[in-house]
A protein has these predicted regions:
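Positively charged n-region of N-terminal signal peptides that target proteins for export
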Residues: 1-4
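Bacterial N-terminal signal peptides
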Residues: 6-15
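N-terminal intrinsically disordered, low-complexity segments enriched in P/E/S/T
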Residues: 19-157
């Protein structure tokens, strides 16, 4: 009788950790004061949901990603305000993960009038909330090497 009770208590104490809120993501650079993107701020943006296939060492893998476009995040936070589109094309941004992994993109890649790459800041994969934070995926890439797990910062340069 004691063992089942201990199991239930253990599960109840772990429940908050299993449903912990996703951490904030910092946006820095290009003359803007650093911005901490919270899940509540991102929830106010339009949601995109897309099936994305990447080549893996085990063959193609398809997942359904749900989140917000990074372009929408930058626009909503006025990160590129004051820059003409031509000036925006000279800018890049570095996406950093909690483990130190970094990938660079150009604004031209994601700008709707140019590359229009729909970089997605993902909150759920295959209908399940992510553990450990936000993920960035680049639909259209053949391989997932530019996907960033547990995004902590987007630095505009």
């Amino acid at each position: 009788m004691l063992r089942p009770l201990l199991l239930v208590l253990a599960l109840l104490t772990m429940a908050p950790a299993l449903h912990a809120e996703q951490p904030a993501v910092a946006i820095t650079g290009i003359g803007t004061a650093p911005i901490q993107l919270t899940p509540q701020m991102l929830a106010a943006l339009p949601v995109i949901e897309r099936d994305v296939t990447f080549e893996t060492s085990k063959g193609p893998a398809t997942r359904r990603y749900k989140g917000v476009l990074l372009w929408d995040v930058l626009q909503a936070n006025k990160a590129l305000d004051g820059l003409k589109p031509v000036e925006q094309l000279k800018k890049t941004f570095l996406v950093s993960a909690k483990d130190g992994y970094q990938i660079a993109f150009s604004i031209g890649e994601i700008h709707p009038d140019f590359g229009n790459l729909p970089l997605i800041l993902v909150s759920t994969v295959d209908g399940k909330p992510l553990d450990g934070g936000w993920r960035l995926v680049a639909p259209g890439d053949k391989r997932g090497a530019r996907a960033v797990y547990e995004v902590v910062k987007v630095e505009l340069r």
